[in-house]
């Protein structure tokens, strides 16, 4: 599907809301109707051609008293789903009586196989039918979605044409709609509906197709020579509409095929939002990526695409995977997960993915993305190839959290166990609904020999191609050439302007408490049982882990020379990755000149004010008052005045 065809399809669906729902529904409700019916039509159109054969086979099964007719009907449809009602969306639209139309569409819903029923329930389609019937809009909506000028099927619409020589041939009239393009349309519609109503889905960012291809290539390219004829598993614990799963699957199979390997892949995912879960499940059913919906691990049945919170409702408990690729929510609170666990405090969490009995990887309640990383770490296989994790984060995962806190502990665990292969900074404005820069973490438990004990930081913030037209906030994309450049930086493993290779210890630091003698009101040192009483200072020092001479030497040199009474307190080991410290930002010459002009102008303005300010802040202009403590005598009535005065002394 080219851009012109994509834009035509998107505009048609977007305008259905304005043509059918306007004045009958609140704008905030448009997405609750348009998106589910778009997915339903995508399923419906695939079953049209086999409708008669399915009804005939169903009648055969009933006459032979076959209770489980699913295998027979899915064989007829060629998909892992079917519908046993007499209706399609095209035949439904012919009914003009609202009540009969309602009965017919409910019968149509009830005729679907169980997994489509799950999709209908997650979309709350039966409730929407009631609303549409009441507003007398259901018939018009069905008319639009069955229009001959749009195609929501994965298969192209063909038509017969007669050539100049009189021969006939079938040509494509409308292209098929693949899984990821469907996901792109779904997410762009959702974004536009939200923009129309000033709604933002905090922290939730659809991953652009060009970006996902890079994720897949980062997972497979460095180990492509180690791939064997085998089955590989791919997991996404924040799978949204399934775009990452399907694109990464394509990339792994493509690269393996280029290496002359015959591989099969199985995909696993989990999603919390009902609408995106339903869309993901529908598209994986349609595209043939999933031929059955559940698998057994031990004695427990699991859904390949699980519904619920990955954090507190693990849909793949105990399962390990070959590739874990995710783009989890950024800065999204996870307090609701405490309720699902039935606890009130995060200290009560005992899930072994996040707490090993000694060390906690549990972050602050305001941001869940590190929990997704810990979840993926727990999925790593102890196999010759191990597991490769490629996960997208914002900048906060690099450094937030104090030493000894959950975020720092997780970084410490990853780095000390030599799991961190690389972190790649991507360009700003690379996503549809956020301008922030993103960072790709590449984690593996099978590092190649040259990488052991090392971490590679890659600055790809300027490796991008500018878009002719912005898509939301997205103004650039990662082209094939850009992807190759980034992959070359990773695979070549060299120090240069865009790549820095560091020892693991570089990221460690000691957070050291400072203790000072307690003083009484007279300024005298407090003694307890003949010993000096020490109290913790409100400030602590961060000492590089690899500081020459260690903590004691740093403390002696940097603290005790200025404060001989201070002594060392508790030292806690933390880890952080100050990415910007290792790359210099190139500043444009014009930008520098403009900045110099602005600074010069500000200097002149400040200098013109100084005589007035310094005169006003003479000591005799400051009000003094008697201190309640006789030690101090007279003190300024307003401390901010005396502090500001010293700026001009």
Feature names for model-found ranges:
Residues 1-223, 292-297, 302, 310, ...:
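Non-catalytic, mostly N-terminal accessory regions of nucleic-acid modification and defense proteins
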Residues 4, 312-614, 618:
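A conserved structural/catalytic subdomain of Rossmann-like adenosyl-cofactor enzymes
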Residues 15, 232, 265-267, 626-630:
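Positions in alpha-helical segments
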Residues 21, 38-44, 48, 190, ...:
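Hydrophobic/aromatic-lined pockets within catalytic cores
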Residues 28, 180, 232, 262, ...:
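Structured loop/turn residues at beta-strand edges in well-structured enzyme cores
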Residues 145, 215, 413-414, 648:
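Hydrophobic C-terminal alpha-helix "anchor/cap" residues
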Residues 204-326, 331-336, 340-344, 394-396, ...:
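Conserved S-adenosyl-L-methionine
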Residues 611-649:
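Amphipathic alpha-helical segments that form coiled-coils or helix-hairpins used
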């Amino acid at each position: 599907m080219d851009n012109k065809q994509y834009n035509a399809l998107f505009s048609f669906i977007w305008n259905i809301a304005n043509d059918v729902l306007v004045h009958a529904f609140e704008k905030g409700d448009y997405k609750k109707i348009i998106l589910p019916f778009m997915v339903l039509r995508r399923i419906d159109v695939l079953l049209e051609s086999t409708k008669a054969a399915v009804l005939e086979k169903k009648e055969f099964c009933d006459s032979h008293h076959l209770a489980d007719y699913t295998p027979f009907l899915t064989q007829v449809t060629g998909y892992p789903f079917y519908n046993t009602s007499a209706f399609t969306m095209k035949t439904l639209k012919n009914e003009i009586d609202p009540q009969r139309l309602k009965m017919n569409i409910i019968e149509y819903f009830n005729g679907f196989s169980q997994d489509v029923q799950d999709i209908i329930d997650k979309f709350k389609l039966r409730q929407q039918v009631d609303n549409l019937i009441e507003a007398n809009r259901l018939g018009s909506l069905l008319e639009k979605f069955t229009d001959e000028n749009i195609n929501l099927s994965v298969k192209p619409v063909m038509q017969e044409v007669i050539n100049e020589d009189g021969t006939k041939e079938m040509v494509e009239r409308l292209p098929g709609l693949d899984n990821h393009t469907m996901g792109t349309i779904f997410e762009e519609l959702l974004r536009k509906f939200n923009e129309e109503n000033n709604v933002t889905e905090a922290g939730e960012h659809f991953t652009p197709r060009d970006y996902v291809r890079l994720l897949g290539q980062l997972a497979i390219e460095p180990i492509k020579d180690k791939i064997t004829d085998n089955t590989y598993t791919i997991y996404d614990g924040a799978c949204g509409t399934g775009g990452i799963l399907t694109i990464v699957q394509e990339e792994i199979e493509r690269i393996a095929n280029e290496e002359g390997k015959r591989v099969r892949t199985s995909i696993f995912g989990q999603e919390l939002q009902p609408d995106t879960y339903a869309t993901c499940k529908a598209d994986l059913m349609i595209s043939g990526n999933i031929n059955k919906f559940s698998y057994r691990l031990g004695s427990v049945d699991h859904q390949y695409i699980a519904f619920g919170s990955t954090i507190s409702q693990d849909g793949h408990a105990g399962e390990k995977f070959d590739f874990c690729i995710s783009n989890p929510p950024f800065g999204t609170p996870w307090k609701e997960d405490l309720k699902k666990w039935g606890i009130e405090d995060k200290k009560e969490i005992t899930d072994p993915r996040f707490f090993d009995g000694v060390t906690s990887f549990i972050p602050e309640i305001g941001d869940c993305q590190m929990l997704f990383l810990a979840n993926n770490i727990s999925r790593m296989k102890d196999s010759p190839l191990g597991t490769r994790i490629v996960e997208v984060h914002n900048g906060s995962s690099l450094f937030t959290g104090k030493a000894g806190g959950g975020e720092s502990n997780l970084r410490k665990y990853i780095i000390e166990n030599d799991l961190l292969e690389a972190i790649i900074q991507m360009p700003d404005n690379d996503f549809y609904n956020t301008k922030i820069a993103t960072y790709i973490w590449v984690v593996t438990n099978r590092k190649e020999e040259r990488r052991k004990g090392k971490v590679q930081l890659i600055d790809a913030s300027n490796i991008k191609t500018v878009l002719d037209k912005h898509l939301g906030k997205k103004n650039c994309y990662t082209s094939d050439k850009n992807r190759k450049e980034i992959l070359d930086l990773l695979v070549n493993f060299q120090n240069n302007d865009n790549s820095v290779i560091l020892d693991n210890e570089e990221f460690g630091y000691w957070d050291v408490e400072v203790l000072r003698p307690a003083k009484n009101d007279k300024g005298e040192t407090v003694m307890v049982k003949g010993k000096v009483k020490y109290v913790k200072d409100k400030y602590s020092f961060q000492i590089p882990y690899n500081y020459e001479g260690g903590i004691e030497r740093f403390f002696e040199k940097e603290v005790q020379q200025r404060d001989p009474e201070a002594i060392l307190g508790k030292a806690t080991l933390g880890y952080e990755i100050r990415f910007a410290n290792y790359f210099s930002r190139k500043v444009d010459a014009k930008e520098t000149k403009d900045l110099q002009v602005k600074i010069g102008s500000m200097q002149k303005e400040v200098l013109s004010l100084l005589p007035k300010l310094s005169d006003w802040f003479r000591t005799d202009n400051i009000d003094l008052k008697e201190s309640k403590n006789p030690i101090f005598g007279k003190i300024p009535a307003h401390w901010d005045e005396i502090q500001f005065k010293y700026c001009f002394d």
